[in-house]
Swiss-Prot record:
This is Galactokinase. Keywords: ATP-binding, Carbohydrate metabolism, Cytoplasm, Galactose metabolism, Kinase, Magnesium, Metal-binding, Nucleotide-binding, Transferase. It is an enzyme of class 2 (transferase). GO terms for molecular function: ATP binding; galactokinase activity; magnesium ion binding. It comes from Streptococcus mutans serotype c (strain ATCC 700610 / UA159). It comes from the Bacteria. Catalyzes the transfer of the gamma-phosphate of ATP to D-galactose to form alpha-D-galactose-1-phosphate (Gal-1-P). Coiled coil: none annotated. The active site is at residue 174. The record marks 27 as: Transition state stabilizer. InterPro entries: Galactokinase, Galactokinase_bac, Galactokinase_CS, GalKase_N, GHMP_kinase_C_dom, GHMP_kinase_C_sf, GHMP_kinase_N_dom, GHMP_knse_ATP-bd_CS. Belongs to the GHMP kinase family. GalK subfamily. PANTHER family: GALACTOKINASE-RELATED, MEVALONATE KINASE/GALACTOKINASE.
Amino acid sequence: MKKQELNQAFTHVFGREADATFFSPGRINLIGEHTDYNGGRVFPAAITLGTYGAARKRDDKLLRFYSANFEELGIIEISLDHLIFNKKDSWTNYPKGVIKYLQEAGHSIDTGMDVYVFGNIPNGSGLSSSSSLELLIGIMAEELFDLKLDRLDLVKIGKRTENDFIGVNSGIMDQFAIGMGAEKKAIYLDTKTLEYDLVPLDLGDNVIVIMNTNKRRELADSKYNERRTECEKAVEELNVLLDIKSLGELDEETFDEYAYLIKDAKRIKRARHAVSENQRTLKAKKALAAGDLEKFGRLVNASHVSLEHDYEVTGIELDTLAHTAWEQEGVLGARMTGAGFGGCGIAIVAKDKVAALKENVGRIYTETVGYAPAFYIAEIAGGSRVLSRK
């Protein structure tokens, strides 16, 4: 969406020009799935699909929100003095949480805003539309109220909004990737220390294709929180003899030696995924840095296998996409990305084989599942940013 279109859309809804326009990306995760809340490593990248916004500062205490994605809801009005979760307020609960926690952190947001939002991340696709929105609202407030805001602090406020305001027990990966993203680079992040490297994403003659199951997933209502609880229980059981804060501290050899302490076969599988995926992510970074794309692809495939069999978060939709992609010519690797239970997969595929991938995977998926998937090329983008000022 062009800056001029954003301004025109804002003026059409609110009757006045915006003070500034903004963009906040979505994200994919190359590898390192369900490791961020297990104290492990992740390897995400911001993408050019994302959330556009325009905003104007008000003189009163009114927050007015409008989303072009939810036109039927019209303008949703909320008082700055009444920032509490209310299911009736739909998507605006995310902005409310961000503003509330910015205020609690000592930042002065003393008047309201008019906010226009348009996202081209498919809702429920697992490409982090909610985190994209959280960071968008954060940079709007930063710009309009001249806040002296450290980007990492804003990332943490986004995570807190997700956890404490919305009620989803997610890790920090999504907000970090969206807030700290850089063009043509992936972020290798240690979620325990928040130390990170920006790694050039040089895929040669290959591209990343996002494969959308078109099965919407509702994170808070899914088994996401259940998986986290299973892993936390496994840590408790391992700590009968070990002294660890998270599964991310273990290598596979140590885990295999002490896995007998976990008293439930299902929890052993969950913990084994967290440990092995963490090690795969470390190997994947090294493979990418060395230009060994074939090894990188094999690790991506192994990640899906572990998510399918040990963590059990895939389902027929994601499995059909990944398994079918593995059989296609020119595919280095494919797996689910995001929390699972629907959402999207990714495939790393030769540029000249993309059309065949779409045709073949699309056909087999439609025959198997009963409706068609969608495909997009993932361009790697910079993080949340101001597009224009008045």
